[in-house]
Each structure stands twice: as C-alpha cells, then as structure tokens.
C-alpha cells in the first residue's frame, strides 16, 4: 500500500469517527427527536453504513448495548442500522442480543435489519438462531424461536423443535411457542399445533393461556369453542379479553351466553371486546 493510500484510509477512518461522534451528539439532543426524525437522521446513518466503518464495530456494539439498557428504541435502531450496514454478518450476534431486551415492542426497524442479514447470510443466521434455541437464557430461547419462525417460514423443517419447546420450564418461552404456532409456522403440522394450543389454553401461567387463546381464534370446531366459552371463568382479564375476540363468528346459545358474560365483565377491555364481537 502506498503512503498516499494509507493517508487516504486514515482520513476516511477519521471522518467516519467524526460522523459517529456527530450521531452520538444528535441522538442525545431531544430537539432532534419528534416528527420526521428518521428522515433527518438518515443521511448521517447512511454515511456510516459502509464496510469501511467496520473498524468501529466494538464502539458501535457498546453504544447499542447502552441504548438497549436505556430503553431508547430510536437510538438503538439507528445504531443497529449502522452496525448492520458496516459489519454485515459480523453484526448478527449483537442485533440478536438487542432483540432479547426489546422491552417496548418497538423493534420493527431492528427486526428489518435482522431479516436483511438472515437473507444475506442464511447459514450463519440459522447457526446462531439454533444456538439461541439451546441457550440456558430464556430470553435467548425466545429470540431463537422468533428466528426459526422467520427463517423456516411455514414450519417445514423446524416445526418439531419449536413444538417440543411447549414444555419449556419458562412461561415466557411457552408463551412464545403459542404465538408462533398460531402463525403461519403452525402449518408445519396443523393437528399437533392445535393440540399444543389447546393444552396451552389450560397452562398454569396466564401469559401462556393468553397467547394460546388468541391463537385458537382461527379454529372453529366444537372442542375449541367449548374451551373458549369456559374461559369466561378465567381469573386473568387478558385471557378473557382474547377469548371474547376468539369467539367471534361462532354460532350457538353457549357462545352467546359467554359473550353476554364478557360484556358484563368487571374489566372494561373485556367488555369492549365482547360488545364489538356481538355487534
């Protein structure tokens, strides 16, 4: 490498570091947030989304962790977008780790970056996702399930692995299984998915019952209908809420009686759901 090329490379790295410092300052400025913030930040973020900026990976990962800990989804997603563009497949682990701590369900942009990485590097993606499924950390297992449902759309290859996790000791993991089996992933084995969801609707943990009951809304057979009617006696208001919605477009006096009970429920959200279903 010539002295001129070395000088040019050093100058480019210096410029990228200044751009990252500017991004830090703007992310810390509350006046930069608000309507149109994404568009205002895009030029600076795009400037950093270059493989030349890969040398900044350790600093970007530290910033990502800080924004995740601060529950700042806007800053987190800007840094994650930079990290994915600059580092490619090497950013996968950090972005998956950030997904584990998405406490505000604001991870849509982060998910889009992960989906792009999954498409570009499928072999490394499935390796990391499978490792997540086998992790001792329940949060990591949840993200592993999410990743499998994305990569194996329709459950053709990994349905059994996810289905077996319906017996996971952690209720949040079991709840994730219920919502996953209620999605298109469940077509990998519809009878088993249905059986697991029915069992999930009787799980001791309310978060599992909620997701199972919500997922059973598309099953209109008598067994499922009777189960949803029985949810009028569930002690968890969100189970009752989802049961009311899942009883939509089902005939019969027992369904009508259950909806009338939901419409008189002590919880306002349950009452509103039942009244909407009843018309």
What are these regions (language model features)?
Residues 100-167, 172-183:
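Eukaryote-skewed repeat-based solenoidal scaffolds used as protein-protein interaction platforms
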Residues 1-77, 81-85, 249, 272-279:
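N-terminal alpha-helical scaffold/docking segments in eukaryotic complex subunits
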Residues 10-28, 51-67, 88-100, 121-134, ...:
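Amphipathic alpha-helical scaffolding segments comprising HEAT/armadillo-like alpha-solenoid repeats
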Residues 256-279:
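Leucine-rich solenoid repeat scaffolds
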Residues 32-38, 69-73, 104-108, 138-139, ...:
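Alpha-helix N-cap/helix-start positions at coil->helix boundaries
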Residues 38-42, 58, 77, 93, ...:
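Alpha-solenoid HEAT/ARM repeat scaffold
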């Amino acid at each position: 490498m010539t002295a001129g090329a070395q000088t040019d490379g050093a100058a480019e790295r210096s410029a990228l570091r200044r751009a990252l410092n500017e991004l830090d300052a703007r992310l810390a400025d509350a006046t930069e947030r608000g309507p149109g913030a994404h568009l205002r930040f895009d030029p600076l973020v795009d400037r950093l989304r270059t493989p030349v900026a890969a040398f900044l990976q350790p600093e970007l990962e530290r910033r990502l962790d800080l924004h995740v800990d601060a529950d700042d989804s806007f800053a987190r997603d800007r840094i994650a977008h930079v990290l994915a563009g600059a580092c490619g497949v090497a950013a996968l682990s950090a972005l998956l780790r950030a997904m584990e701590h998405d406490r505000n369900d604001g991870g849509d942009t982060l998910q889009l970056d992960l989906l792009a990485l999954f498409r570009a590097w499928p072999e490394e993606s499935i390796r990391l996702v499978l490792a997540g499924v086998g992790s001792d950390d329940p949060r990591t297992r949840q993200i592993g399930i999410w990743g499998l449902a994305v990569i194996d759309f329709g459950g053709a290859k990994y349905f059994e692995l996810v289905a077996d996790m319906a017996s996971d000791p952690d209720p949040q993991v079991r709840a994730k299984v219920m919502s996953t089996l209620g999605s298109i992933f469940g077509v990998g084995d519809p009878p088993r998915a249905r059986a697991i969801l029915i069992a999930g609707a009787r799980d001791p943990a309310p978060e599992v019952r909620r997701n199972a009951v919500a997922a059973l809304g598309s099953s209109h057979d008598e067994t499922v209908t009777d189960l949803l009617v029985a949810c009028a006696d569930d002690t968890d208001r969100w189970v009752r809420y989802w049961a009311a919605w899942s009883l939509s477009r089902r005939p019969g006096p027992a369904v009508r009686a259950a909806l009338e009970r939901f419409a008189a429920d002590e919880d306002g959200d349950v009452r509103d759901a039942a009244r909407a279903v009843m018309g």
